[in-house]
């Protein structure tokens, strides 16, 4: 398992390095170099993630039936091809097509990687291993963001094209690294519906609750920077300091927090506590607009992000345990693909929702958002118990049938 973990971590680190460089430069590349409007970029990326969300379950099912390692390798190659194709984009329609291909490949790759992890790692260790991969991912994103920052400083067409080349090369490299892992045999063909997760209402509820909790992502990446610039006296460089604090917190503490989650009861409690901590973080962010001292505002914001990091660590550790444990072992791909749609939906719907809520309503909006986090956290334990009862009474329809 030690060698497999190192290989999984290396693949995650390489891919996320490319992601980090792409994420910090893509908007300016599409607007400044390609010449599209901000609205066109927003619509295209939203459509891309929407298509990706729809593709997650069938691609996860493909990983179950054909073997997750091979499917993950192919989808990493597809992601590399999609990123490279952005070089050819000159107008909006091709941009939408490539964005859809990119979103599909990325979402499917995530599902296949989770299925691969489930196939290589014993159930008792999956959450801890997933936490290690998350730490590697955040480290890679930080390195990639630094590379992207260099391209932003140069601000030339060649620099942005170099970022796309680096991103494509990173996913190509990740595919080659994944080939070093042992093959996980395909799951046996089973009786019952092919995409069983689409009929699993308790799992759908758990996924919905997790999606609400995942609104912390656009909160941190979009709303907090806007709030700092428009509603507080803090200097704009505070944004970088807050993102650095978040990244460092995840890299340093995610594995430690995940070690405390051992089973569904611990996982449910972890998500519930995450909701409470996120409520506190929203309250602190709201307070940062009071007063005119830049240093006081900055200190309050740092306290808010520290709370947000704790909530993120608790949420991630609990959600991973829940998503793996409630999924049948022979359907991990499609179940992880479905659970992963929460990330795509939060990225797709979160910016507009939170901008209206927080930037439109101010302090009241922060309170409403915090109560949303609290409500979702409190709802998770009974939802998990419902799903667990459903697993206990499921008839033996998942036995393998001869093909």
Region roles according to the model:
Residues 98-139:
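Cytoplasmic helix-loop-helix junction between adjacent transmembrane helices
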Residues 269-315:
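C-terminal transmembrane helical hairpin of 12-TM major facilitator-type secondary transporters
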Residues 1-6, 181-213, 402-403:
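Juxtamembrane intracellular "pre-TM" segments in multi-pass secondary transporters
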Residues 54-67, 152, 252-271:
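Helix-to-loop junctions at the C-terminal end of transmembrane segments
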Residues 1-50, 202-246:
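Helix-loop boundary and gating motifs at the non-cytosolic
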Residues 70-85, 168, 269-285:
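Structural signature of the two symmetry-related core transmembrane helices
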Residues 149, 169-187, 379-383:
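C-terminal membrane-cytosol helix-exit motif in multi-pass small-molecule transporters
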Residues 53-90:
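Conserved MFS/SLC helix-loop-helix module at the cytosolic interface between two early adjacent transmembrane helices
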């Amino acid at each position: 398992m030690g060698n497999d973990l190192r290989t999984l971590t290396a693949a995650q680190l390489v891919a996320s390095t490319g992601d980090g460089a792409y994420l910090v430069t893509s908007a300016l590349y599409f607007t400044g170099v390609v010449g599209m409007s901000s609205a066109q970029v927003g619509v295209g990326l939203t459509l891309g993630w929407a298509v990706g969300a729809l593709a997650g379950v069938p691609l996860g099912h493909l990983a179950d039936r054909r073997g997750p390692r091979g499917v993950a390798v192919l989808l990493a190659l597809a992601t590399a091809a999609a990123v490279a194709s952005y070089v050819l984009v000159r107008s909006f329609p091709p941009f939408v097509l490539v964005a859809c291909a990119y979103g599909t490949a990325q979402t499917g790759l995530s599902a296949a990687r989770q299925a691969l992890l489930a196939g290589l790692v014993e159930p008792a260790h999956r959450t801890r291993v997933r936490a290690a991969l998350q730490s590697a991912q955040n480290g890679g994103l930080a390195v990639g963001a630094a590379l992207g920052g260099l391209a932003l400083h140069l601000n030339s067409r060649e620099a942005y094209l170099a970022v796309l080349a680096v991103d494509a090369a990173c996913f190509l490299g990740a595919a080659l690294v994944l080939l070093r892992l042992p093959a996980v045999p395909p799951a046996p063909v089973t009786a019952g519906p092919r995409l069983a997760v689409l009929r699993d209402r308790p799992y759908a509820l758990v996924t919905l609750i997790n999606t609400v909790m995942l609104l912390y992502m656009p909160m941190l990446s979009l709303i907090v920077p806007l709030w700092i610039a428009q509603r507080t006296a803090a200097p704009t460089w505070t944004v970088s300091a807050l993102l650095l604090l978040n990244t460092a917190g995840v890299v340093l503490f995610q594995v430690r927090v995940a070690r405390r989650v051992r089973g569904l009861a611990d996982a449910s409690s972890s998500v519930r506590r995450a909701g409470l901590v996120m409520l506190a973080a929203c309250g602190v962010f709201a307070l940062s607009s009071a007063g005119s001292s830049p240093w006081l505002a900055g200190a309050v914001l740092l306290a808010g992000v520290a709370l947000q990091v704790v909530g993120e660590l608790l949420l991630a550790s609990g959600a991973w345990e829940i998503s793996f444990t409630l999924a049948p072992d022979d359907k991990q791909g499609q179940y992880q693909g479905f659970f992963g749609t929460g990330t795509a939906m939060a990225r797709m719907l979160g910016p507009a929702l939170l901008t209206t809520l927080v930037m439109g309503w101010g302090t009241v909006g922060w309170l409403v958002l915090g109560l949303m986090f609290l409500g979702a956290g409190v709802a998770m334990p009974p939802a998990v118990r419902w799903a667990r009862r459903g697993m206990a009474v499921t008839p033996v329809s998942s036995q393998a049938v001869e093909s």
